[in-house]
A protein has these predicted regions:
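A post-motif C-terminal structural segment
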Residues: 30-32, 41-47, 51-94, 99, ...
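Extracytoplasmic mature domains of secreted/periplasmic and thylakoid-lumen proteins
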Residues: 96-180, 187
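Cleaved targeting-peptide boundary
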Residues: 20-26
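Sec-dependent N-terminal signal peptides
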Residues: 4-13
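Active-site-adjacent structural elements in enzyme catalytic domains
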Residues: 28-40, 44-45, 50, 122-137
């Protein structure tokens, strides 16, 4: 009998493990959510950052993250176990996994490759995000603070929709028109003058490379952009020109928290991922430690506020980094100084080091390398450098060089070579310059005490966050309401799609009501419709209206035809 009871108990426990660790229907709502994503972060990345911090300051053996670690997340695409930044955070904020490259957009049916069931009728269409629901259904303030350019995958995931994460023109247009309250990011190159004018006309302060302006901004509606593309790696950052991630979070919270209805804030340590893509031993640790300081800022606010939940998670892992490698003999017996001091000798990122070497004559190669890395280059290493086509001062003509390194995703090919040289002098190793498929960490602070434990799927984490805003089970219907195919929304009316006239323009949807002569013109990716007829007017709606070329459809609110009555 006892044996039967034991077997029954084990069966019950196993059955419970297959369910979500916390029932979203029992989660008590909070007023505010801070979603913090460290892009491309493996457990090894966190361990390295923690060791570097402790080695430099023994009074700090733990990260700000550590008290709130509560489980792991299985993060994946809709048709592939290894995630991409676009669909992974997209899943966290929509509740649906999607394909690599898809920004808050529904995936196509890939047959046997599907990990979750797919409705083919929804393929390529936009999916509403938790940020959009918080703004439109609950009147909350919204924004994001990131270190990449603002149309990059993760910030785009919460504020735009398209199946191609690289379509910055359409993504940035949606972000400008999606009523975000605060944006602090890189990416001056991607905000054009027309978009800046639109923001200013709608009460925003726009700060471009103006850290003082950002700090002194009194408006609760602000865009602050730094650099042409991404912000600098933390190890290279000039504090007089760019804010830290923690400072950006503090400024955003001071503005968003003025809304009595609450807020949703996305924070991304964007370049943890970039450093791992580049296999950059100099940048990975400092980049995550900068994110960890932002965690401290966010949690401190949340504890004082008493009605704010902080969700801390990676979207996927990158690089396959290990601490310890076969080529480092007896590494398990080496002291922390032997393992970590060589990394701390690196004074700049690989990209910055490459630029520095290219700014100096060849005669200075060895002393400059020694100054910024602590490494005395061997003859073999010098030979590798002078054969790199990315080294501008090589005594060997480019056509005679025999380059031996691939180009990293976000960095010059020269950085790839420098990665090999620097990494050879450390305890670190990487398996890839791409993403990896292991589960990622999860940390949560909830003033109500309810946090997901153990292993959670990306969809389950999405449901938990929806429940924190009392929106569990409501996001899909909201998505259907604001993103209806134009042929359904305007059924019975005359309509046509006008293709973009040039690269800098967007398609237009023209709808006519022949009964009263009214006509509506919608420019893709905006929230604006022009009405003409007996009287002309411009209306601005709460949601953006994306156009998808693969379906040749605009996606508009289901009641949009009311403006033509």
């Amino acid at each position: 009998m006892k044996r039967q009871l034991l077997v029954a108990l084990i069966f019950m426990l196993c059955a419970s493990w297959s369910k979500a660790s916390i029932d979203p229907q029992k989660v008590k709502p909070v007023k505010n959510i801070i979603l913090m994503v460290s892009d491309g972060t493996s457990f090894s990345t966190i361990s390295l950052a923690r060791w570097l911090q402790y080695y430099q300051d023994p009074s700090k053996p733990k990260l700000n993250l550590d008290p709130y670690l509560c489980g792991t997340v299985r993060t994946n695409c809709s048709d592939a176990p290894i995630g991409d930044s676009a669909p992974t955070t997209s899943c966290y904020v929509t509740g649906h996994a999607s394909r690599a490259g898809y920004v808050a957009s529904y995936p196509p049916d890939m047959g046997a490759a599907n990990i979750d069931p797919i409705d083919p009728k929804k393929s390529y269409g936009p999916m509403a995000t938790l940020l959009e629901a918080a703004k439109q259904l609950q009147g909350k303030s919204t924004g994001f603070v990131v270190t990449c350019e603002f149309p990059h995958a993760t910030p785009a995931d919460v504020s735009a929709h398209y199946y191609n994460r690289g379509y910055y023109d359409g993504i940035s247009e949606q972000q400008v028109h999606n009523n975000l309250d605060v944006v602090i990011a890189g990416g001056n190159n991607y905000l054009n003058q027309e978009q800046e004018n639109y923001l200013k006309e709608h009460g925003y302060t726009v700060c471009r490379n103006d850290i003082a302006g950002m700090r002194n901004c009194k408006s609760d509606k602000m865009w602050a952009l730094f650099n042409g593309t991404s912000m600098a790696y933390e190890i290279d950052r000039d504090p007089s020109k760019e804010p830290s991630l923690a400072e950006g979070v503090g400024i955003a919270l001071s503005k968003l928290s003025k809304n009595k209805k609450g807020f949703f804030l996305l924070v991304e340590g964007s370049k943890v991922d970039w450093a791992n893509h580049a296999n950059d031993p100099a940048s990975v640790g400092p980049e995550f430690l900068a994110f960890d300081k932002a965690i401290g800022t966010a949690v401190e606010f949340a504890k004082k506020d008493g009605n704010t939940a902080v969700i801390i998670v990676a979207d996927h892992a990158t690089g396959g980094m290990s601490i310890g490698k076969a080529s480092l003999r007896n590494y398990s017996k080496r002291s922390k100084a032997e393992l970590f001091q060589p990394i701390l000798n690196f004074k700049m990122s690989l990209d910055a080091l490459g630029a520095k070497l290219n700014s100096e004559p060849y005669e200075n190669l060895r002393p400059v390398f020694k100054e910024y890395t602590g490494i005395d280059l061997s003859d073999e290493e010098v030979n590798l450098i002078i054969h790199s086509k990315g080294y501008n001062n090589s005594p060997i003509p480019k056509e005679q060089r025999k380059e031996q390194q691939d180009k990293p995703l976000y960095s010059p090919s020269f950085s790839g070579l420098l990665s090999k040289i620097l990494t050879d002098h450390t305890c670190l190793a990487w398996t890839t310059g791409g993403h990896t498929g292991e589960d990622v960490y999860l940390g949560c602070y909830n003033p109500k005490g309810q946090v997901p434990l153990g292993m959670n799927t990306n969809v389950e984490l999405a449901h938990y966050m929806q429940a924190l805003f009392g929106l569990y089970g409501k996001i899909d219907q909201f998505s259907d309401d604001i993103f209806t195919c134009h042929d359904v929304a305007f059924n019975g009316l005359d309509y046509k799609v006008e293709k973009a006239k040039d690269k800098g323009s967007f398609p237009k949807l023209i709808v006519k009501n022949s009964a009263n002569g009214k006509m509506m013109t919608i420019s893709a990716f905006s929230n604006i419709a022009q009405i003409s007829g007996s009287e002309s007017k411009v209306i601005e709606i709460a949601s953006v209206m994306p156009y998808v070329d693969r379906t040749d459809k605009f996606y508009v609110p289901k009641d949009m035809a009311k403006y033509l009555k």
